[in-house]
Each structure stands twice: as structure tokens, then as C-alpha cells.
């Protein structure tokens, strides 16, 4: 039996560790990052700009980068198409520290050794982009989808962690939409479990604006509003974790916070909508919305309750007085 290697909490808390480095502050760190987006949405343009920004040490979407060598495996493109994109994006001399390949080995076969070999010849390499993930993997028909996805990424993660690399995997999205954008990534949740960060690009057809959703183990959750023009992505607006949460709260809930009288209120969902003069919310979803966002209501001084009587289903909304509004005078 191999003995379990452990560390005490006391030792762990007293041991200095190098912080995980971020190649692009707030976006790309060491390890595995998955970026997914619809076909023909501009993902490859974005990845090329990311490579150029890192190679030149320039900001990417207004985020600071650390200058380093970059390797872009454009496995669904050819050199002619890459050259056309470079002509559009490069104003001066093209950086020698950005390298391309349009062919690569398969994961679990030659790819890992190819990356190790390239790193040995280019010690300053820190960014590897693989476009796309599907081009380097061979699904195992005898393994379930979760196990296959997890094993696939674990192999790359071990490589990234061991060599201090940021490996970005370009992936596709499902056609079916979801409230959680990260659930739209093609494949099982094994991809989410094994990755360090996930980025989803949502862009409607024939629109030049898009939303970039970002989440990760060492990253603050963010949402970026972007614009795509002439092959270039630019930042329009940025939302942090708290602002994202605020945006996810329906207007109806914000209206409830403003409306509830000091003495509180009780009645049916129909009566609530009538008294608030709300016409765009179905009575059938009122209790669901109130219950789903009861924590937000409580943070804003309103306690939501629900009870059934013989004749009706009643909603109670009680406004909690703050310390300044206390009715007790001593």
C-alpha cells in the first residue's frame, strides 16, 4: 500500500507558495482555459488578437498582459487564411515571438511531446492556443462521456501545470440556449470539472456586438460587452461579479423592493400585480420569482413568506425596519 501523503493545516498555512500567474490579468491564468462560441462568431479573430497581445506585451480587451512567446495551433485553418488575418491586425512588424502550426498530433499520442519539444526550444513560451479541441482528440467509445472529457483535459492540465503554460482550448457551443451560458459548451460537465477557467462568447448572427462570460477557480466572475468590427474585438463595457448578480435580478423584484409599504403587505399574486400595476408578469410565476430571489429581497429589508388557506394562496411581504427606523425610543 502506498502511504497517503498529507500536510497539516498548521504547516499549510505557514508555507509560502508562489501565486498562480495570470498571463492576461483577470482572464487567462496558468492551466487550462476553455473558450466556446458559435461557429463563425469571430473566435479565431479573438484568439489571434490574444496571441499578438501577449507576444507584444500589449493590453488585450483593456486587460494587462505579460509579454511572452505564444504558439497558436490553427487546426481548422490554412496559412493563407492566417496571413490574411495578420495583414488586417498587424500594423507594424509582425512579432517573432508568435508561432503558428496548422497541423499537430493527437492528444494522448504526439501532441504532448510536440508541445514539450517546442517549449524546450522556446523557453519563453507561456501561451498555447489549440483551435479547436475537437481536432486533437479521439473519443473513446468504451468510456462514458464525462470520464472521456475529464481524462482528455487532465492530460493537458498536467502538461500546463508542469511547464507553467496557459493552454487555451477553443470549443463549440450547443445550438440550444441555456440560462447558464457555461452549460452551452459542447460535451459533458467533465470539461467544466477539469478546466481552470471557462469563457463563453455569445453573439447573434449578423450582429457586431457580443457578450463574453468569464468564470474560473482563480478569476472573478465577469461579463464583458464587446464589439466586433473589421476583425478587431473591442471592449464596450465590463461587469464584475456583484454587478452581474444585480443584472440577473428581474425588474419585477426590484419593483417589489421599492413598492412594499412600511406596514407590510399580504394577499394573492393577482392582488399584488394589480396593486403594483404590473401587467407584464404572469400571475403563475409571481411566487416562483419571489421565492427564487428571496435572498435578494432579504438583503434589501424585505422578508418574503407564503401560506395557504382554505380559500387562497397568500403572499406576505414584511419590511424589516433598520436600526435608524426603529420604533423603540429609549
Predicted segments with their positions:
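Short, conserved catalytic or adaptor-binding loops enriched in Gly and charged residues
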Residues: 88-97, 188-192, 296-297
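Hydrophobic positions on the alpha1 helix immediately C-terminal to the Walker A/P-loop
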Residues: 46, 50
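Phosphate-binding/switch region of NTP-binding enzymes
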Residues: 19, 34-36, 40, 44-45, ...
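Conserved inter-motif catalytic segment of the P-loop NTP-binding fold
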Residues: 2-4, 10, 18-19, 23-24, ...
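Post-Walker A helix-loop "phosphate-sensing" segment adjacent to the P-loop in P-loop NTPases
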Residues: 53-67, 298
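DNA transaction DNA-binding modules
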Residues: 222-330
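Conserved RecA-like P-loop NTPase ATPase core
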Residues: 28, 51, 72, 131, ...
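Pre-Walker A (Motif I) flank of P-loop NTPase domains
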Residues: 29-33, 68
